[in-house]
């Protein structure tokens, strides 16, 4: 098997095992990597070197190296990833190989490696072999620095505008801003922003919470009525409006949840104070508004005097002077009744007793008998109706033409027809009694003695009297007695003797 010329310099190690020195070198380099975060380019180179097999750098005058054994893949990958290992070496570097290796190692690690016992060295060897099979962990990123960003290493990308946060604190957390310099320049990459949002949460939460505005002092009772309720409400609105959504978005959800109870307590206290002051001011304003003089209400109407009698039978119609009779809708032809007539008509009404003394005694005098004559009062009332309707709708005959009397039906009327009432008018007046038509026809037959369709004064008065008797409950007679005709004939108070015809 041919030996590479560069391998000759590697075969001249210093006193001590080469594997021990390589293990110490790799352990020291791992400590440095843990302290310093790798950049984006170094991550990509390390990932590429671990994924593919290591290839040696081709230099001028060199041949292809044999495949590297599979026992140390990570060690050779780390050596190839470092600057200086992949570059071609000259023969001069091979001659001074021992000094180069010593110069790359720090003094502390060399002194520590020489004085260490063999037990720890063996553990370091085992750790290097295990680390070759186990992939390297992702390094923990360092806390963000507030200095100016390095524009040479970080690519320039635009940050998408975040949506405005909800007013009442929604469940979605607000996007966090890691540094002020990155917001101004807008040079944060999406990968670094996602890692900062996922891993820098506790770092932002550790910042001190912003101080809440001082709580206003309680107003004294002497100063509360002096201030107007409008000024207090305006101050309360200004304090609420000072919390802008942009300032609220910089706080973390933990801070918002933690300070929500205190803000609610403060707002409730402000609302109670503002409401109490507003109530006091409104009461003062209403007291001033109501101080104006009010017009006294009108006095209630006086009650009308009423009779204090227990029994309603003793009360008369004329107790209330304000009672007015309703105006009649039709023209009245009868005379108004006098007080003497009413007293005479109601003479037997007041003689009635609640409990009769002799229940089996027949009151013969109190019984209403058939009247054989028309009273003077009734006759005057009926004559008034006759006087208002006599001669109505009766044509007047012309006495000059004798030939026309035979042909004209008006010639059958007597010369005194103007003092009579026509049958049509009689039917209209008698029908107002609401008696049935057969009864009215019977009364007409009893009264009409001339059979010419006209009624004289006596006939009309007797007919009216028969209607009233029928309404009172008396039956119609088969023939009108002579006493009734005599009571309505002539002048009242004078009786004329009957002469034979």
Curated annotation (Swiss-Prot):
Residues 87-99, 188-200 have a biased composition (Polar residues). It comes from Aspergillus clavatus (strain ATCC 1007 / CBS 513.65 / DSM 816 / NCTC 3887 / NRRL 1 / QM 1276 / 107). Keywords: Lipid metabolism. It comes from the Eukaryota. Belongs to the IRS4 family. Residues 138-147 have a biased composition (Pro residues). The keyword Coiled coil does not apply. Residues 1-44, 363-375 have a biased composition (Basic and acidic residues). Gene3D superfamilies: EF-hand (1.10.238.10). This is Increased rDNA silencing protein 4. The gene is irs4. The keyword Cell membrane does not apply. Positive regulator of phosphatidylinositol 4,5-bisphosphate turnover and negatively regulates signaling through the cell integrity pathway. Involved in rDNA silencing. Disulfide bonds: none annotated.
